[in-house]
Regions:
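Glycine-rich, low-complexity intrinsically disordered segments
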Residues: 1-195
Length: 195
């Protein structure tokens, strides 16, 4: 006997419009807030610059790895451990190299170029960072706090006589202990805070 399915109701564009709260979140409306270890003594202006010059980031992925348990030719999936992806940001380089220099100093405090010594205590080289998803009125829809991040890769910046009409950019890969989400304060803010 065939299973009967109820036909879904007709969906109209006006129904869709009523469900798209606030006109939808825009991927170009965001701001990144960085912190650097006190030990590296960077100018406080660098943190403010980063709010403008970090041109790309990501809201974090959420992963729980499955555990496969075999049973008589079948595989039972059991929830395993939570894992956290590397968080990558893209930075526009200005002529004073202040943000790149801050990340280079941070990495050097972890493992010095000259002699491979560096900070032993994670509290000395890990900091929290935030990415804020903004609404079109400038209010914060939702924020993500990345706990205990530290850089593990600063990308190279290619130089060439043939490159014109371009500003240098570089990426930074940051390791993340875990993250939490913070509900925004605007009229369209959604979701619940989770940590």
């Amino acid at each position: 006997m065939a299973t009967q399915f109820n036909r879904p109701p007709l969906r109209r564009i006006t129904d869709f419009k009523s469900k798209l709260v606030g006109g939808g979140a825009r991927p170009n409306l965001f701001e990144v807030e960085l912190a650097f270890p006190e030990e590296i003594a960077i100018d406080k202006d660098v943190k403010d610059k980063a709010r403008f010059l970090v041109k790309a980031a990501a809201l974090p992925a959420s992963n729980i790895t499955p555990i496969d348990v075999n049973f008589r030719g079948r595989i039972l999936k059991i929830a395993g451990d939570r894992t956290f992806d590397t968080w990558t940001i893209t930075v526009i380089n200005d002529t004073d190299f202040s943000i790149r220099s801050a990340f280079e100093k941070w990495m050097n405090s972890i493992n010095r170029l000259s002699d491979a010594t560096g900070a032993n205590n994670p509290a000395d080289y890990q900091e929290d960072a935030y990415v804020h998803q903004l609404d079109r009125d400038g209010s914060t829809l939702r924020s993500y706090r990345f706990y205990d991040v530290f850089p593990t890769n600063i990308s190279q910046m290619d130089l060439s006589y043939e490159t014109v009409d371009t500003i240098e950019e570089f990426t930074v890969e940051l390791q993340v202990l875990y993250f939490g989400s913070i509900k925004g304060v605007g009229d369209n803010a959604g979701g619940e805070s989770i940590s």
